[in-house]
């Protein structure tokens, strides 16, 4: 209410007390509170909003913090951390897994309780091996370290038309350590609510190069994570990893060192309904908006 309404209400309350008596002290306190509230309210109903941190940089996805996961064939510590929303270092500490962070089929990865000092292995627990993608032949050095001289052509007119909000993107030189992982049309953006898209989607042509967005080590190459198809995960440092999903064919293997701009896969549609690259950047296990890191287009 405004100050005028507060004064009118105070007059009404005083008249009521003269008629019915009693409760003077209580009503006086109420009147003072109302007047103080009115005088401190911003004019025009303006709402004061703290802009600091109002736009979340990462999807608010809470990591799994209870239960356990039994390691299957093809799993790595990094792929398990990626799947369940953990920072790989924290998950390693929780389970007492020391560098080089090797895990075994049948090992129980704990998400709850206290950090362990010894890795635990499930006993008498049947383990169903997950399908394992055939490991691709490593790219010869002359090819693996090269960067395409010019971007791949835009999607042909016969492909599915992009949405009205689609934005053309072109792979190019790295800026601030990051480069676009593919050329094509930006058809999906990062979102921390609703559909919860934890990265961006780039539509392109079947078989076109998918490039490492920054240098690092391949820590996962396979198809064991539901919803990602043929997936590559690259560890860049102790803080950041990047992921490249829905590929037709993988050109790198786990443990391989890659450089920014190196071809790591061929774009495809595995695990989805159209040819596209799903690209994510994760900071300490949390998805962040790749557009805040990639060069502006």
From Swiss-Prot:
What are the subcellular locations of this protein?
A: Cell inner membrane
Q: Which PROSITE patterns does UniProt cross-reference here?
A: LYSM (PS51782)
| Pfam families cross-referenced by the UniProt entry | LysM (PF01476), Peptidase_M23 (PF01551)
What parts of the sequence cross the membrane? none
Membrane found in the keyword field: yes
Residue segments, region Disordered: 134-168
Has keyword Disulfide bond?
no
| Signal peptide start and end residues | 1-22
- Entries under CDD domains matching the protein: LysM, M23_peptidase
UniProt superkingdom: Bacteria
Q: Which UniProt keywords are present, listed alphabetically?
A: Cell inner membrane, Cell membrane, Lipoprotein, Membrane, Palmitate, Signal
Naming one, the record's GO cellular component terms include: plasma membrane
Q: Provide the lipid-modification sites (N-palmitoyl cysteine).
A: 23
The membrane-topology field of this record reads: Lipid-anchor
Give this protein's Gene Ontology molecular function annotations: metalloendopeptidase activity
Q: Where is the lipid attached (S-diacylglycerol cysteine)?
A: 23
- Per UniProt, residues of the LysM domain are 67-111
Regarding protein family, the annotation reads: Belongs to the E.coli NlpD/Haemophilus LppB family.
Q: What is this protein called?
A: Lipoprotein NlpD/LppB homolog
Q: What is the lineage of its organism?
A: Bacteria, Pseudomonadati, Pseudomonadota, Gammaproteobacteria, Pseudomonadales
């Amino acid at each position: 209410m405004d100050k005028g309404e507060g004064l009118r209400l105070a007059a009404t309350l005083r008249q009521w007390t003269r008629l019915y008596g009693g409760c003077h002290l209580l009503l006086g306190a109420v009147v003072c509170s109302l007047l103080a509230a009115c005088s401190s309210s911003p004019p025009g109903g303006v709402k004061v909003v703290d802009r600091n941190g109002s736009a979340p940089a990462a999807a608010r996805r809470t990591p799994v913090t209870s239960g356990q996961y039994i390691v299957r064939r093809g799993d790595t510590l990094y792929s398990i951390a990626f799947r369940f929303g953990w920072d790989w270092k924290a998950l390693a500490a929780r389970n007492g897994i020391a560098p080089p962070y090797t895990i075994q089929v049948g090992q129980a990865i704990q998400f709850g309780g206290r950090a362990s000092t010894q890795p635990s292995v499930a006993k008498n627990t049947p383990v169903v091996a997950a399908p394992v993608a055939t490991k691709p032949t490593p790219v010869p050095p002359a090819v693996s370290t090269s960067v395409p001289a010019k971007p791949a052509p835009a999607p042909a007119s016969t492909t599915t038309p992009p949405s009205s909000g689609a934005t053309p993107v072109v792979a190019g030189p790295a800026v601030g350590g990051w480069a676009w992982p593919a050329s094509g049309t930006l058809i999906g953006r990062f979102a921390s609510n609703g559909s919860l898209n934890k990265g961006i989607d780039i539509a392109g042509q079947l078989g076109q190069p998918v490039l490492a967005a920054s240098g690092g080590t391949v820590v996962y190459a396979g198809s064991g994570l539901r919803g990602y198809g043929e997936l590559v995960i690259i560890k860049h440092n102790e803080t950041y990893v990047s992921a490249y999903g829905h590929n037709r064919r993988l050109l790198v293997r786990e443990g391989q060192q890659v450089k920014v701009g190196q071809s790591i896969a061929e774009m495809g549609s595995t695990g989805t309904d159209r040819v596209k690259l799903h690209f994510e950047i994760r900071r300490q296990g949390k998805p962040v908006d790749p557009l805040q890191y990639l060069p502006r287009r």
